[in-house]
Amino acid sequence: MPDTTPQLRLYNTLTRTKEAFAPIDAKNVRMYVCGPTVYDFAHIGNARPVIVFDVLFRLLRHVYGAQHVTYARNITDVDDKINARAARDYPDLPFNEAIRKVTESTNAQFQADVTALGNLQPTVQPRATEHMDEMRAMIDRLVQRGVAYVAQDHVLFSPSAMNARKGPRYGALARRSLDEMLAGARVDVASYKRDEMDFVLWKPSKKGEPGWPSPAGIETLGRPGWHIECSAMSMAKLLEPFGGGLKCDDPERNQFDIHGGGIDLVFPHHENEIAQSCCALGTERMANIWMHNGFLQVEGQKMSKSLGNFITIRDVLNDGLPQLGEWGDNTVRDRWAGLAARLSMLQTHYREPINWTAQRLAESADELHRWYGLLRDEGFGAPEKLSHASAVAAALCDDLNSWAAITALRQAFKVRDVAALGEGMALMGLLDPYFVTASDVPIFARADVDASAIAARIAERLNFINAKNWAEADRIRDELLQEGVQLKDSKDPATGERITTWDVVG
């Protein structure tokens, strides 16, 4: 770790403490994040973990080197919701072809949407359908070890059998006993279950549904449960390439560094992942650090279709900033809206609940406009190394304190430290070089305008305002407007100080 970078500390849901991050292997830092189920447009709640863990991915690359970090985010392409959508949207197609159409188109849209939000591509994006062999092998191991059993062509995991063994306890992540979890959970009490808390690893496929050869000697075709998919995919991408997996008896090689997702996944999904992986691989921990982002509300209310406030990422990109109007290339406009959405979300610490508002999105767009305006005026070039981002890096090393990082960016803007501003924005995924260099971006249409002269007039006007000489301040504003330059006054969100920006009009 470079001497100038402080110790990275992350809050671990498993221990309920903020811990110093010590990778298992600093040359192979590994992170897994639960990704989308590709059956519909992703909503803004889905965007939050993508942005949060993209910032962490960038930070890990900054600290340990890009070539030493592996980030896996899965794609769930086997699910009842996918089946239902395929039957609804493509009733005339063979079912497997209909499913393929749903998953391919939805995944393509998801990738385009999250790219517009300024996110890097993960190192790998495994799909569930590509890892059936690993799922079957893991299920067979769990049956052999007595923590899973076959019943009516299903394979089920038994938390009580796990807790009867030496080793990690079921419920450690959620910090609840089996009785407490049963009392607070909605569970499927099927006749073939031995206990109510038992959960499905594999189930038979109904006629016409997609199916694969089953594990554990079951003769009918079937498909995996949700939880085993992530255990198998993380094993395939973060353990087996580094010497771990079902053939490895070394517990340390069968762990990776960080597992992330939304707070809603703590139970049952992540609890069940831990149970499966630890029992199959003989380790105390599936991942050393478990991180979870908080819930999202819209304008102070839970987001739901029934309330009419269900907002997709695509809605934000297309319609979230109507003041942008139509651009010659609307994909570029979408990228600008995506950066504004990213900044808006990062103004709340990832573990806190976030309240999504149209006002904050607009304010974030205005702030980005000011930052990019300075970078453009000073001719900032995309950096090869982030040698001036120490203040932002220090903030992010404190459990991804994005608010403190944004405060550092605001300070850099205030003192016109262009290197610190631009490189700090890059570390947070807020820097798109196109918006710094392109001459045809509508919001920066300032051809034949002397930016330094306007800045001097704005400074002169500010002096008049501070002296309460309103008439002279208004005179400068009106003169600039006659010259086709409109001033806009606002306040610095952090300090409350007056900020004046300008645009070419007419």
UniProtKB/Swiss-Prot annotation:
Subcellular localization, as worded in the UniProt entry: Cytoplasm
Reaction(s) this enzyme catalyzes, per UniProt: tRNA(Cys) + L-cysteine + ATP = L-cysteinyl-tRNA(Cys) + AMP + diphosphate
Enzyme class: ligase
Positions occupied by motif 'KMSKS' region: 302-306
Pfam families listed in its UniProt record: tRNA-synt_1e
Swiss-Prot/TrEMBL keywords: Aminoacyl-tRNA synthetase, ATP-binding, Cytoplasm, Ligase, Metal-binding, Nucleotide-binding, Protein biosynthesis, Zinc
Cofactor stoichiometry and binding remark: Binds 1 zinc ion per subunit.
InterPro entries for this protein: Cys-tRNA-ligase, Cys-tRNA/MSH_ligase, Rossmann-like_a/b/a_fold, tRNA-synt_1_cat_dom, tRNAsynth_Ia_anticodon-bd
EC number(s) stated in the UniProt entry for this protein: 6.1.1.16
Residues reported in the UniProt entry to bind ATP: 305
Motif ('HIGH' region): 36-46
Residue numbers binding Zn(2+): 34, 230, 269, 273
A Gene Ontology cellular-component term: cytosol
Key word Magnesium present: no
One term of GO molecular function: cysteine-tRNA ligase activity
GO biological process: cysteinyl-tRNA aminoacylation
Disulfide bonds listed in the record: none
Cofactor: Zn(2+)
Alphabetical list of PANTHER family matching this protein: CYSTEINE--TRNA LIGASE, CYTOPLASMIC (PTHR10890:SF3), CYSTEINYL-TRNA SYNTHETASE (PTHR10890)
Assembly mode: Monomer.
Sequence similarity: Belongs to the class-I aminoacyl-tRNA synthetase family.
Name of the protein in its database record: Cysteine--tRNA ligase
Biological classification of the source: Bacteria, Pseudomonadati, Pseudomonadota, Alphaproteobacteria, Hyphomicrobiales
